[in-house]
């Protein structure tokens, strides 16, 4: 995924609580985080909205201009809007009811690999969710403070798709 350019549908609209329109252009910033969440299974568990609010507050307190693009593919829009409202999530989200983002980008099926650190050109620099993994969060914060990927050491999260599985010898 590293270096892959994320494609945005022509009409991408972000709104508060999934209903009050805020903006429809992708922010131009050195870094941005894109997180895609489909609502199969426990949407609230995947989203962890209170943790995202804490992370956003941390970025703001550090005066880091890093937009976070929440792309939500709801199974039930009303339920997802209720979750946003219940958690007082006052940050814009894109309700992708037609799953256009996934159709254009073919995101990995594992939700742990559906959050991406993007550069100004929407190319993937890293993959991983900073609210689900403390080490990812620390890595992202280092990136934002340094401004580049040069000289990074330590563990990095990668994903590789392998379409063949060796089942051994069958008798």
Give residue ranges: language-model regions.
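Short active-site neighborhood of thiol/selenol oxidoreductases, capturing the structured segment around
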Residues: 19-54
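Structural beta-sheet core signal
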Residues: 35, 68-71, 117
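Thiol-/selenol-based redox modules, centered on thioredoxin-like
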Residues: 112, 117-171
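Short, compositionally biased leader-like segments
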Residues: 78-91, 155-167
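Structural microenvironment flanking redox-active thiols in thiol-disulfide oxidoreductases
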Residues: 41, 46-86, 100-103
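N-terminal "domain-start" segment that seeds a small globular fold
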Residues: 1-26, 47
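Extracytoplasmic
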Residues: 28, 63-65, 110
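Short, internal strand/loop/helix patches
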Residues: 81-114
């Amino acid at each position: 995924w590293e270096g892959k350019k994320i494609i945005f549908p022509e009409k991408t609209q972000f709104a508060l609580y999934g209903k009050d329109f805020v903006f429809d252009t992708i922010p131009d910033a050195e870094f941005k985080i894109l997180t895609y969440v489909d609502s199969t299974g426990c949407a609230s568990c995947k989203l962890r909205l209170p943790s995202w609010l804490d992370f956003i507050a941390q970025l703001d307190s550090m005066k880091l201009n890093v937009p976070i693009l929440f792309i939500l593919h709801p199974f039930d829009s009303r339920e997802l809007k209720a979750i946003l409202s219940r958690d007082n999530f006052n940050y814009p989200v894109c309700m992708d009811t037609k799953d256009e983002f996934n159709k254009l980008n073919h995101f990995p099926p594992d939700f742990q690999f559906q959050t991406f650190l993007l550069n100004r050109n929407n190319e993937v620099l890293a993959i991983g969710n900073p609210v689900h993994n403390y080490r990812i969060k620390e890595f992202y914060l280092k990136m934002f403070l340094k401004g580049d990927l040069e000289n990074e050491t330590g563990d990095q999260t990668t994903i590789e798709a392998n379409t063949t599985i060796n089942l051994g010898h069958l008798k």
